[in-house]
């Protein structure tokens, strides 16, 4: 099955498709193993001093990958970096994406796991809008969400939440946190 990189990136960033992560890794670096080496070098280059990669999928110790770890601070730095790349910023702002048909599969619709994009009526705020997001879940980290938001003055904030018990809890607490921040920054 052959897709352009943009399709694989949409599959990875919108719905966290593990097969897309491995395909991107192998395609970009020649093998998943070489990609892991590249990602650890890139993490150092970006100043992500508390991050180590040992798989392309993003699974951690709770899922049997003992050398995969990061911190909220490093993830926020990474989010800031990927929001500078317009193709990635565009992808993480989508509520949905339709994977095109290919020679062996019919196309299918992917839906973002971000309630700010898929259920905006539940988590609307007059103080900010969400312009990018990535969610995930592992046994060790729990339910996680990274949000990039901006207010009417264009001020951007990146908010990371790890260890959530449920998506609803994360979105309620992140909305409160972002509203607090935007109400109090000058």
Segment roles from a protein language model:
Residues 1-11, 15, 21, 25-34, ...:
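Active-site-proximal loop and beta-strand segments within enzyme catalytic domains
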Residues 15-16, 153:
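Short flexible coil/turn linkers enriched for glycine and charged/polar residues
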Residues 16-17, 74:
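Membrane-embedded alpha-helical core segments of multi-pass
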Residues 30-186:
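Penicillin-recognizing serine hydrolase domain
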């Amino acid at each position: 099955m052959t897709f352009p990189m943009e399709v694989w990136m949409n599959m990875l960033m919108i719905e966290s498709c593990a097969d897309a992560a491995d395909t991107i890794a192998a395609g970009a670096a020649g093998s998943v193993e070489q990609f892991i080496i590249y990602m650890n070098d890139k993490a150092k280059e970006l100043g992500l001093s508390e991050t180590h990669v040992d798989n392309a999928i993003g699974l951690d110790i709770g899922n049997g990958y003992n050398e995969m770890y990061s911190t909220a601070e490093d993830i926020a730095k990474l989010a800031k970096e990927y929001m500078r790349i317009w193709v990635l910023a565009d992808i993480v702002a989508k509520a949905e994406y339709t994977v095109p048909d290919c020679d062996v599969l019919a196309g299918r619709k992917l839906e973002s796991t971000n309630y700010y994009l898929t259920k905006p009526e539940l988590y609307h705020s007059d103080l900010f809008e969400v312009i990018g997001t990535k969610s995930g879940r592992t046994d060790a980290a729990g339910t996680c969400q990274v949000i990039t938001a901006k207010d009417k003055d264009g001020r951007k904030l990146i908010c990371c939440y790890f260890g959530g018990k449920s998506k609803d809890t994360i979105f309620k607490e992140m909305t409160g946190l972002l509203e607090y921040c935007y109400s109090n920054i000058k």
